[in-house]
């Protein structure tokens, strides 16, 4: 199981992409908070009051080298474009976490031609590589696509669980309703009364 270090993209006055009354910076911070809640002690959230790109934060970062850095973003384009994918630094091979994350995000937010996209023109993947950190940037669908955005907002818990599972981080089972209408947790019935 990995320890996840989560950076929420944009912020500190930079709203990032916008769509349907939402900003990328606010949405990815909401997702980061959900990851923290569900992942517990296996997740550390980077200071969300910063813009880690603008202030060059990764270059002064001091975390254990075996922690996995995940930077959260949402894409923007014309409303018909959709889908999620993982970005890694050009010249590096995807590791098991990149692959698992890409498989999950492309099934949760389908639509992109490439699940994993190596890039050599982004600062934070390069900075993390220079510092020897394992890093990937996750595009959580398009904020400008109503389907992606509605799924992001309406199924954020499922999105967070899928991300955490890609890193081998177990999460609490969601509460479910038993056949007798009683709420159960973790698949264990709290009331064994059978109704006929």
Language-model features, listed with the residues they occupy:
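Ser/Thr/Gly/Pro-rich low-complexity, disordered linker/stalk segments of secreted
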Residues: 172-194
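Surface-exposed patches in mature extracellular/periplasmic domains of secreted proteins
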Residues: 42-50, 111-119, 174-176
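Solvent-exposed, polar/charged alpha-helical surfaces in well-ordered, non-transmembrane soluble domains
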Residues: 26-33, 37, 99, 103, ...
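Active-site-adjacent mobile loop/cap segments within catalytic or ligand-binding domains
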Residues: 5-7, 61-64, 69-79, 117-177
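Short, solvent-exposed mixed-charge patches
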Residues: 1, 195-196
């Amino acid at each position: 199981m990995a320890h996840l270090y989560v950076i929420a993209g944009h912020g500190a006055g930079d709203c990032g992409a916008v769509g349907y009354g939402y900003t990328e910076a606010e949405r990815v911070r909401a997702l980061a908070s959900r990851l923290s809640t569900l992942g517990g002690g296996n997740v550390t959230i980077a200071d969300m009051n910063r813009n880690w790109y603008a202030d060059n934060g990764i270059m002064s970062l001091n975390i254990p080298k075996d922690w996995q850095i995940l930077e959260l973003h949402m894409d923007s384009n014309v409303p018909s474009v959709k889908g999620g994918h993982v970005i890694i630094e050009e010249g590096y091979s995807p590791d098991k976490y990149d692959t698992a994350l890409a498989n999950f995000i492309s099934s949760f937010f389908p639509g992109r031609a490439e699940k994993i996209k190596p890039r050599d023109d982004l600062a934070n993947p390069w900075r993390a590589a220079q510092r020897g950190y394992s890093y990937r940037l996750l595009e959580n669908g398009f904020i400008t696509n109503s389907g992606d955005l509605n799924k992001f907002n309406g199924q954020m818990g499922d999105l967070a669980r899928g991300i955490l599972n890609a890193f081998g981080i177990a999460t609490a089972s969601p509460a479910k309703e038993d056949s007798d209408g009683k709420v159960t947790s973790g698949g264990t019935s709290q009331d064994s009364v059978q109704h006929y």
